[in-house]
Amino acid sequence: MATLGVNIDHIANVRQARKTVEPDPVQFAFLAELGGADSITVHLREDRRHIQDRDVFLLKETIKTKLNLEMAATKEMLEIAKKILPDYVTLVPEKREEVTTEGGLDLKSNVQYLKKAVGSLKDSNIEVSAFIDPLSEQINYSKEIGFDFIELHTGKYAELSGSNQHKELQRIIESTHIANDLGLVVNAGHGLNYNNVRKIASINNMNELNIGHSIVARALAIGLEKSVREMKSLITLN
């Protein structure tokens, strides 16, 4: 049964729109946990457009579940991660002009550098995940580089409909099986919402789904704790 990681970046987006102190994403992480979140995910971007260093340090000290730190594999971020010591790090691609992460890491072109980055994090007892597109080549490189987890990018699945969405779902299912056979733990995320999450959650051996925007959007209408509870019930429905 898949677990739920709640991404709270969008809470920080609202705060940073006014460069003020509220809403505090640390407080909302507490509410997400009350709603049943199994982990809290934040993306500390190089430009600090939403989550700030202070948020990540406080989350590490206060949350009761696990902390998943998304970040680019830069020297600065590696040093920060080794100070914070999150439960795990998810390495993601990052472009300054993008609104949100647009695709998975290209592992093939960065094998040697990523081996060093992953090794450095593991030396600090941090488990490491790669955010990748559901492609067998990327999965094989994930294993070669030494990642513990992969997070499959579900953005294309979320954008499609009908038979095209079904084809993408099959690709995600096949990718999950390939990764499991290699000993990799599989997470998934990006674009998942209350309408499309069930089929991803029901994939055999899917470990965790990381979801943010749709939960926060629904929370504006019904409150964060309740919106997390509703998403958790969809993921864990037998």
Swiss-Prot record:
Pathway: Cofactor biosynthesis; pyridoxine 5'-phosphate biosynthesis; pyridoxine 5'-phosphate from D-erythrose 4-phosphate: step 5/5. It comes from the Bacteria. Keywords: Cytoplasm, Pyridoxine biosynthesis, Transferase. Its EC number is 2.6.99.2. The record marks 151 as: Transition state stabilizer. 3-amino-2-oxopropyl phosphate binds at residues 7, 18, 191, 212-213. GO terms for molecular function: pyridoxine 5'-phosphate synthase activity. One of its GO terms (cellular component) is cytosol. It is an enzyme of class 2 (transferase). It is found in: Cytoplasm. 1-deoxy-D-xylulose 5-phosphate binds at residues 9-10, 45, 50, 100. The active site is at 43 (proton acceptor), 70 (proton acceptor), 190 (proton donor). GO terms for biological process: pyridoxine biosynthetic process. It catalyses: 3-amino-2-oxopropyl phosphate + 1-deoxy-D-xylulose 5-phosphate = pyridoxine 5'-phosphate + phosphate + 2 H2O + H(+). The keyword Cytoplasm applies. Catalyzes the complicated ring closure reaction between the two acyclic compounds 1-deoxy-D-xylulose-5-phosphate (DXP) and 3-amino-2-oxopropyl phosphate (1-amino-acetone-3-phosphate or AAP) to form pyridoxine 5'-phosphate (PNP) and inorganic phosphate. Belongs to the PNP synthase family. Homooctamer; tetramer of dimers. This is Pyridoxine 5'-phosphate synthase. It comes from Prochlorococcus marinus (strain AS9601). The gene is pdxJ.
